[in-house]
């Protein structure tokens, strides 16, 4: 790997594709808590983290698999689930007394209308303060899952299920 004195081996977490240290430093210097959104094929995870010298402390978190408690039976890795998870996270965080933070998407590509920004829209709609532009949010039709209901018979009730789950989440935290 390193073949001479001029070769610099990147940090391990950078080599693994897990940490962007330049972005992390900027986020830490901002002095605000970080709202970390991570997505996989099956889930969306959101955490509110605060940096300490010993390591980051998690204040609040939500995972899209928690939506089953609110009657959501759709896929947990799609845009609809990302929005609902963001909504759940925002209301949980507000209930615990946290009011805002700054978005950390890590090494994920920043694409307008993506699941990351669907989760961000859910967080913002809950009343949690995150500085952002509304230009990056997906359309309301995509958030409700109408694009899935059009072509997939099993998910034809997804928009109704979305509204019912959203009402249950608001009912629990009001």
From Swiss-Prot:
InterPro entries in UniProt: Rbsml_uL18_euk (IPR005485)
Family annotation (SUPFAM superfamilies): Translational machinery components (SSF53137)
The entry's keywords: Ribonucleoprotein, Ribosomal protein, RNA-binding, rRNA-binding
Keyword RNA-binding assigned: yes
GO cellular component: cytosolic large ribosomal subunit
Listed GO biological process terms: ribosomal large subunit assembly; translation
A GO molecular-function annotation: structural constituent of ribosome
Free-text function comment from the UniProt entry: This is one of the proteins that bind and probably mediate the attachment of the 5S RNA into the large ribosomal subunit, where it forms part of the central protuberance.
Family: Belongs to the universal ribosomal protein uL18 family.
NCBIfam families, per database record: PRK08569.1
Subunit details: Part of the 50S ribosomal subunit. Contacts the 5S and 23S rRNAs.
Protein name per its UniProtKB record: Large ribosomal subunit protein uL18
């Amino acid at each position: 790997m390193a073949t001479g004195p001029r070769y610099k081996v990147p940090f391990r977490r950078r080599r693994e594709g897990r940490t962007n240290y330049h972005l992390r430093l900027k986020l830490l210097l901002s002095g605000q808590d970080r709202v970390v959104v991570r997505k996989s094929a099956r889930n969306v995870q959101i955490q509110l983290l605060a940096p300490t010298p010993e390591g980051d402390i998690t204040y609040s978190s939500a995972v899209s698999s928690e939506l089953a408690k609110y009657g959501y039976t759709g896929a947990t890795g799609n845009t609809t689930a990302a929005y609902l998870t963001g909504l759940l996270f925002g209301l949980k965080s507000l209930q615990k007394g946290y009011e805002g933070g700054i978005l950390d998407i890590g090494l994920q590509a920043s694409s307008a209308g993506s699941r990351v920004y669907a989760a961000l829209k859910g967080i913002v709609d809950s009343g949690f303060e995150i500085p952002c532009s509304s230009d990056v949010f997906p359309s309301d039709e995509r958030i409700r899952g109408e694009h899935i209901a059009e072509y997939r018979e099993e998910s034809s009730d997804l928009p109704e299920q979305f509204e019912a789950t959203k009402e249950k989440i608001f009912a629990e935290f009001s």
